[in-house]
Each structure stands twice: as structure tokens, then as C-alpha cells.
């Protein structure tokens, strides 16, 4: 195995670079000792994690390389044995060289095994000085996702490239969306429970039992199941649904009564406002007292002037009229009884 030793001296008299290269790419080690000024934290992290980043070119190819960002130029130019090739834009550090040997991992812990072009594999077995520094970036041979994903189907929804271009690349979003798709597939594959259809006879019998008692006992439930050819669970669920329906109907009726009361109160307030403007200064003559709730208002109007419809104020007026008529009838009856007592004379028995 032939080994080459290269000593590079800097023009300012600083220590040179001792480099030992071999033709074997596995045994090839690069040892550089270049005095550099302290780097910033951003440049430090670029050296550590620069090989994990991907960059898409304009033609749709993905460039994956050990140098995602250009490091600061080195003071000492790079010379090779094969020719005078110098590039001040390329600087190799120990951290970048050591980390480039490890494969890249995605956020799921899977190693990214990128296929390489045969020409690139052939280039890796040659020495570095046979190629210019522009071959640092490796272009992947495959650009688009697998055919199943390109056709619109998600062959593996866990991978980030399976999502459309509009979705964010957040790992938490990808994991949550994958779980959502899994739950949806399980739900679609599961057979839905058939809804029980009750006949007219069964419904009438159950309605009769519900009107007798809203909560059915276990013994009675067993008897109904035998009679109607149903299961006890079906009867139990029917009673639960019927009670819920009753509560909904009752709540709707209460809401309707409340709305009617609000409408009637607003209508009577408008009538009282009109009556206050037309009321004579001496007071109310010939008016009637109209009650709304517990408050009574004097209105300069007759009952015939108010609308006789299904509103609540009309019902109050009807109740007041009936009460007055009953009072008048009682007074007339009392007067008739007194007259009868006065006309009748006692019979003297001798």
C-alpha cells in the first residue's frame, strides 16, 4: 500500500500541515492542524450539523453533502500532488471529518440510506487530489418519492416526504397526522352496528309501558323481551332514548312559554306607552286594569280594542273578564236569596 506524505507550509511562517493519505478509502485519515482564530457559535454548529441538512436545487434534485454551508476561508491554501489546484473557499476541520463518517438519521431514528450513482461510487475510490473541491456535494439519483406516493396514495404515512407540499414539516404534526390516518383506517374497516328497526306493534307496546312507568323493572323487561321478540338490551336502550326525548320536548315547551311571555311583555309595554301619551289629565275613565305577571297597569282601552289571539296578554284579559262575571253572578245570587227570605212569611201553628 503506497502512502503519500505532504507538507504544506504557509507563507507567513506558521507551522505546516502534515497529511498522510492512502489509496484505500477506509484507511484514509486526514489529520490537519491549522491555527485558526476562535469561531462564532453559529460556525461551530454549522461544522457539527452541516452534513445533516439537505438543499434542493432549482432543477428538483436534492443535494446532500458533508458541507451544507461554506465555512470561513482558511489562511493556508490547499495544494495537491497531482496539480496546482488551490481553493481558499474549502477548509476541512476535524469535527466535520469525524462526523461525516456517520450516516444521517431522520427524526424517527431511521438511517437515511441514499443510493449513490455508479460514477459517484467510482469517484470515492480515487484520491482526493484527482478531483476539484466542487465534488463535495453528492447529488442523489432519485428525486421524486416512490410511485405509490407520487400517484397520490400514502404508502408509508410516517415518512415526512409522504405529505403534500402544503403541510408543515413539524415532527409533531407528522406524527399526529399519521395517528389520525391510522384511526380513520381502523374506523373505516370496522363494520357499523346495524340500527334496530322496531315494528309498529312493538313501538305501541313500548309506548304503553313507558306511559305506565318511565323506568322499567328487570322482570318486566324480561317479559317484554319474550313477548316482543327483542333482547333486554334493546328494550333498555329504547327506554333510555325515550326518556331523553321526553326531556327534550319538555325543555322546548318551557323555552316556547318563556319566549311567548317576553313577546307579550314587550307588546303590553308598547301599548302602555301609547296609552300614556293619550291619557287625559284627570285620570283613567272607563279603563280596565290589565295584569302582566304580578304588575298591573291601567290602560285607557277596552278589552275589545286589544287583540284576541293566542298571545299571553289576551289570555290575561279573558281571565279578568271571567273573574268579573263570576263576581257579578255571585252578587246577583245573593240578592235573589235575600229577596226570597224577605217575601216568605213564617207560618204560625195554633
UniProtKB/Swiss-Prot annotation:
Entry's localization field: Nucleus
Cellular component annotations (GO), alphabetically ordered: nucleus
Source superkingdom: Eukaryota
Composition bias, Low complexity: 324-337
UniProt-annotated stretches for the region Disordered: 1-23, 70-91, 111-137, 324-350
InterPro entries tied to this protein: HD, HD_metazoa, Homeobox_CS, Homeodomain-like_sf, HXA1/B1/D1
Any one Gene Ontology molecular-function term assigned to this protein's record: DNA-binding transcription factor activity, RNA polymerase II-specific
Database matches in Gene3D superfamilies: Homeodomain-like
Tissue specificity remark: Expressed in cells within, and posterior to, the morphogenetic furrow of the eye imaginal disk, expression is rapidly restricted to the R2, R3, R4, and R5 precursor cells.
Description of the deletion phenotype: R2 and R5 fail to be correctly determined and appear to be transformed into cells of the R3/4/1/6 subtype.
Pfam families named among the record's database cross-references: Homeodomain
Basic residues: bias regions: 123-132
UniProt function note: Required to establish the unique cell identity of photoreceptors R2 and R5 and consequently for ommatidial assembly in the developing eye imaginal disk. Repression of expression in R8 photoreceptor by senseless (sens) is an essential mechanism of R8 cell fate determination.
Name by which UniProt lists this protein: Homeobox protein rough
Highest classification ranks of the organism: Eukaryota, Metazoa, Ecdysozoa, Arthropoda, Hexapoda
Record gene name: ro
Amino acid at each position: 500500500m503506497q502512502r503519500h506524505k505532504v507538507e504544506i507550509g504557509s507563507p507567513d511562517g506558521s507551522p505546516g500541515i502534515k497529511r498522510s493519505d492512502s489509496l484505500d478509502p477506509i484507511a484514509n485519515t486526514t489529520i490537519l492542524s491549522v491555527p485558526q482564530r476562535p469561531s462564532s457559535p453559529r460556525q461551530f454548529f454549522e461544522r457539527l450539523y452541516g452534513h445533516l441538512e439537505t438543499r434542493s436545487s432549482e432543477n428538483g434534485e436534492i443535494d446532500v453533502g458533508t458541507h451544507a454551508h461554506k465555512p470561513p476561508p482558511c489562511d493556508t491554501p490547499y495544494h495537491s500532488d497531482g496539480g496546482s489546484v488551490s481553493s481558499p473557499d474549502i477548509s476541512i476541520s476535524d469535527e466535520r471529518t469525524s462526523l461525516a463518517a456517520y450516516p444521517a438519521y431522520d427524526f424517527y431514528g431511521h438511517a437515511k440510506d441514499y443510493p449513490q450513482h455508479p460514477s459517484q461510487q467510482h469517484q470515492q475510490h480515487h484520491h482526493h487530489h484527482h478531483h476539484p473541491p466542487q465534488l463535495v456535494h453528492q447529488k442523489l439519483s432519485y428525486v421524486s418519492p416512490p410511485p405509490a406516493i407520487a400517484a397520490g396514495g400514502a404508502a408509508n404515512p410516517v415518512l415526512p416526504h409522504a405529505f403534500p407540499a402544503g403541510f408543515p414539516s413539524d415532527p409533531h404534526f407528522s406524527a399526529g397526522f399519521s395517528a389520525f390516518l391510522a384511526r380513520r383506517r381502523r374506523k373505516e374497516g370496522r363494520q357499523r352496528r346495524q340500527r334496530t328497526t322496531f315494528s309498529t306493534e312493538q313501538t305501541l307496546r313500548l309506548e304503553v309501558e313507558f306511559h305506565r312507568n318511565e323506568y322499567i323493572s328487570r322482570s318486566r323487561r324480561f317479559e317484554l323481551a319474550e313477548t316482543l321478540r327483542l333482547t333486554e338490551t334493546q328494550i333498555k336502550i329504547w327506554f333510555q332514548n325515550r326518556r331523553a326525548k321526553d326531556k327534550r320536548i319538555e325543555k322546548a315547551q318551557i323555552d316556547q312559554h318563556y319566549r311567548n311571555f317576553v313577546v307579550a311583555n314587550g307588546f303590553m309595554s308598547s301599548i302602555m306607552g301609547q296609552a300614556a301619551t293619550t291619557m287625559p289629565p284627570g285620570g283613567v275613565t272607563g279603563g280596565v286594569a290589565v295584569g302582566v305577571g304580578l304588575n298591573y297597569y291601567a290602560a285607557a282601552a277596552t278589552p275589545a280594542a286589544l287583540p284576541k289571539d293566542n298571545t299571553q296578554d289576551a289570555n290575561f284579559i279573558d281571565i279578568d273578564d271571567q273573574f268579573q262575571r263570576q263576581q257579578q253572578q255571585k252578587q246577583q245570587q245573593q240578592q235573589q236569596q235575600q229577596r226570597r227570605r224577605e217575601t216568605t212569611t213564617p207560618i204560625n201553628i195554633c
